[in-house]
A protein has these predicted regions:
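Hydrophobic/aromatic hotspots within intrinsically disordered, low-complexity regions
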Residues: 3, 21, 35-41
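Intrinsically disordered Ser/Thr phosphorylation hotspots
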Residues: 15, 31-32
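Ala/Thr-enriched low-complexity intrinsically disordered regions
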Residues: 8-10, 36-39, 130
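Long, positively charged leader/targeting segments at protein N-termini
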Residues: 43-96, 100-108, 125-128, 136-464
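Cysteine-centered motifs
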Residues: 27-31, 38
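N-terminal chloroplast transit peptides
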Residues: 1-24
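Intrinsically disordered, low-complexity polar regions and short flexible loop motifs
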Residues: 113-114
């Protein structure tokens, strides 16, 4: 095929590196932090640091202490002595009354886990300002609630709530404009997942937040919600004995995170009876080595929307190449110059889907497995990584691995020309201009959106 010769060439694994964006609290990397306020404890707050260090030392049996990375000067937890693989660092009870953990209680049927935890944070902060009890103010959960960053975190929250009084005149109108413009940005970038996640979140929080009535209360609630989304762990019962729930654990929140698996040296689990949350060493850890948790498999969109930064490196970032198997196969049919009504191709496509288990059997016949996550199978990731489903489908329909890879390269070039041409760049900059002038969005958030788009461009370029 002529198109195959045109795109078959030696692959280069290198590409221009994208901008590094990350949080000093949540992400570990080797360049200066972009957002210093994301650290849980501000440098210079000696009393806060002393209180937290005492908690860390006590509850880790002197295995860990607060310290600073010599290169980045980012605060984190460091090994106070050598720690063996599988050795426990923290063992935190998941009882509601335990002072070391916030647990969503779902006592109010109108609240989901995020609302439950946000209200607990606000209650602790409120009580600390009205109580004369010094012991209560030093209690870990109260100290934690008061040490959280004052700024609202995450673009999703800044689209759904009042943002630190930066919006003028008609706040509701400005907020809605910001939300719509960010949705337009995701549309222009072709990031359907990010747009859907933002829309789902806005719908989820809008009715709940409006119940507060007063602007000041809504602002506080939005702030608390923004803290909760980037600091919780999901607890699931493998035996199905109870519904999943979320927890916030102040001591564990002091750990920095990484998306680079080689840097991760601690992991977490829940006891089988769901009675405790445990952090343990993933491998042997040397004295004075920083303790690092993994972010897990998260796309950049989640960090952008809810964490307020992008990891310096994220092997789990991706670009969607096709929505589903039908779009992929129809595109390939067109690439080969076949008529869209060609019955021979219809039979080939059906056979391909059947062979790969992408059809489910029903009494009335076969139908496409239209799982909501199907489109996440057809993705490109950093370092020119093509997901297995894409390769399997294209190999099956073409019968040749080189042709499958060549087809992916053609598709990547096509997406670049459709979403990242000079006209597209100009359109994106117009959106940014409106965000700055009409909604007073922070310049740093604009740069974050720009970096997100550039990283997607880099992923596409790497495969070509």
């Amino acid at each position: 095929m002529a198109w195959l010769k045109a795109v078959t060439r030696t692959h280069s694994s290198s590409s221009p590196s994208s901008s590094s964006w990350y949080s000093s609290r949540r992400c570990r990397c080797r360049c200066p932090p972009r957002i210093a306020h994301c650290a849980l404890l501000k440098k210079g707050k000696a009393d806060d640091e002393k209180d937290f260090d005492e908690f860390v030392t006590k509850h880790s049996n002197a295995r860990a202490s607060i310290g600073y990375d010599e290169t980045t000067h980012v605060r984190g937890l460091f090994a106070s002595r050598e720690i063996k693989a599988k050795e426990e660092l923290f063992h935190v009870s998941l009882a509601k009354e335990d002072e070391r953990v916030f647990i969503d209680n779902n006592e109010n049927e109108d609240d989901d886990w995020s609302a439950s935890l946000a209200k607990q944070i606000l209650m602790k902060r409120r009580r600390s300002t009205t109580s004369d009890d010094d012991d209560e103010k030093k209690e870990l959960k109260t100290a934690y609630a008061n040490a959280l960053p004052k700024e609202m975190i995450g673009i999703a929250n800044k689209c759904c709530f009042y943002d630190d009084n930066k919006m003028n005149k008609n706040k509701n109108s400005d907020r809605r404009t910001r939300y719509e413009l960010v949705c337009k940005f995701f549309e222009a970038t072709g990031d359907r997942d990010a747009k859907e996640e933002l829309m789902k979140y806005e719908k989820q929080v809008s009715s709940r937040s409006r119940r507060h009535g007063e602007e000041e209360e809504e602002e506080k609630y939005g702030w608390a919600l923004s803290q909760v989304f980037s600091r919780t762990f999901r607890i699931e019962d493998a035996r199905g004995r109870r519904a999943p729930r979320r927890v916030m654990i102040p001591i564990v929140d002091l750990l920095n995170h990484s998306s680079v698996e080689e840097e991760v040296n601690v992991t977490w689990r829940v006891k089988e009876d769901l009675s405790a949350f445990i952090v343990e060493a993933k491998r042997n850890v040397g004295k004075d080595e920083e303790l690092i948790l993994s972010y897990g498999e998260r796309n950049d969109q989640h960090f952008l929307l809810f964490y307020g930064f992008l990891p310096s490196m994220n092997p789990c970032n991706s670009v969607m190449v096709w929505e589903n198997v039908d779009e992929c196969l129809n595109w390939y049919q067109n690439l080969c110059g076949a008529d869209e009504n060609d019955t021979k191709w219809d039979a080939m496509k059906y056979k391909c889907k059947r062979a790969l288990g992408l059809l489910k059997k029903k009494d009335e016949g076969d139908f496409i497995d239209d799982d909501n996550d199907e489109r996440r199978r057809f993705i490109l990731s950093p370092n020119a990584k093509v997901d297995n489903t894409t390769l399997l489908v294209l190999n099956e329909i073409s019968g040749d691995n080189d042709m499958a890879i060549a087809a992916v390269r053609v598709r990547a070039e096509e997406i670049l020309s459709q979403r990242f041409a000079s006209d597209d760049d100009a359109n994106i900059e117009r959106i940014f201009k409106h965000l700055l002038e009409e909604t007073q969005m922070d310049e740093s958030d604009i740069e974050l959106l720009r970096a997100d788009r550039n990283r997607k461009r880099d992923i596409l370029r790497e495969i070509i």
